Amino acid sequence: MVKLRLKRCGRKKRAVYRIVAIDVRSRREGRDLRKVGLYDPINNKTHLNVPAILYFIERGAQPTRTVNDLLKKAGVLKDTGIPVVGTLVSK
């Protein structure tokens, strides 16, 4: 299964995160399938490759909770009520 998740880059005390499509069995710093965006939490900037993100989501990739929030904030995803993998759903 493929996930869209954050991969830490940058230097000490100055983290920048790449948004990558990666196999769930890979480590955080493991080899990614494709880089699809960049998130800078200090400057609060986000750069997204929207066609690539939609390509992976259409083929079943699940964004993590943080990436899902970033995509909603950027307007790429709508709040559809579909649970993200790793979240608790009460019935």
UniProtKB/Swiss-Prot annotation:
UniProt cross-references to InterPro entries, sorted A to Z: Ribosomal_bS16 (IPR000307), Ribosomal_bS16_CS (IPR020592), Ribosomal_bS16_dom_sf (IPR023803)
GO cellular component annotations of the record: chloroplast; mitochondrion; small ribosomal subunit
UniProt keyword Glycoprotein, yes or no: no
NCBIfam families the record matches: S16
Highest taxon of the lineage: Eukaryota
This protein's name: Small ribosomal subunit protein bS16c
Similarity comment: family membership: Belongs to the bacterial ribosomal protein bS16 family.
Pfam family, any one: Ribosomal_S16
Primary localisation category: plastid
Protein source organism: Pelargonium hortorum
Keyword vocabulary terms for this entry: Chloroplast, Plastid, Ribonucleoprotein, Ribosomal protein
Compartments in which it is found: Plastid, Chloroplast
Keyword Zinc-finger: no
GO annotation (BP), single: mitochondrial translation
One example GO MF annotation: structural constituent of ribosome
